[in-house]
Amino acid sequence: MQYRKLRVIISGGGTGGHIFPALSIAGCLKSLNPETEILFVGAKGRMEMEKVPAAGYKIVGLEISGLRRSLSLENLKLPFRLLSSIRKAKRLIREFRPDIAIGVGGYASAPLLRAAQSLGVPTLIQEQNGFAGLANKMLARKAGRICVAYEGMERFFPADRIVMTGNPIRSEIVPADGKMREEALNFYGLDGSRRQLLIVGGSLGSR
């Protein structure tokens, strides 16, 4: 089967909660269309600069950082870093010529998607949480589609552009078969006759 070559920029990161859904999206796009060319854009010095290349994708870093909630002189640098990052993002977009730009949240996605929107590139946002992040709320105003995992997200985003997709899951996370379940029960000393519930903490607070 012949596929049209697609060019996709995926931007966001800072924590695994943004990075791993982004990698899941990239993997799904590749499985649907092997000709898809994907470029990641993240923040220099953050987790995505290691995780994305390890997964086999190219990534470009921007000199951008998040807004500190406490009083800090670093916040004075933020407007200049943002403008510089938007300029670099525009250059990347002109060179790569994407068909679409996808933002997965986090401050790293803001310059890239803002640049894409200003250049007329279609944009899509993926929001993993039940409470939308600041970057996604700002970018949603001009996004073509907003993919969400929970009901009630119209309190953050325009209802007519919301698509309920659930959260992207990596292909390597597979349903446990009987043998795997038995091994887990033995390892944790659990009673196999009872239902088991796994609770996993999220983001940096899970420590």
Where are the regions a protein language model picked out?
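Active-site-proximal region of nucleotide-activated glycan assembly enzymes
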Residues: K58, Q117-L185, L190
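An aromatic- and histidine-rich active-site surface loop
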Residues: R46-E50, P98-L119
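Alpha-helical membrane-targeting segments
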Residues: V60-R97, A110-S118, L134-K142
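Nucleotide-sugar donor-binding and catalytic loop/hinge architecture
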Residues: M1-L6, V52, G178-I199
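A conserved mid-protein helix/loop that constitutes part of the nucleotide-sugar donor-binding site
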Residues: F20-P21, L204-R207
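Conserved nucleotide-sugar phosphate-binding/catalytic loop shared by glycosyltransferases and other
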Residues: K5-G13, L32-R81, I86
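Short amphipathic alpha-helix
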Residues: H18-L29
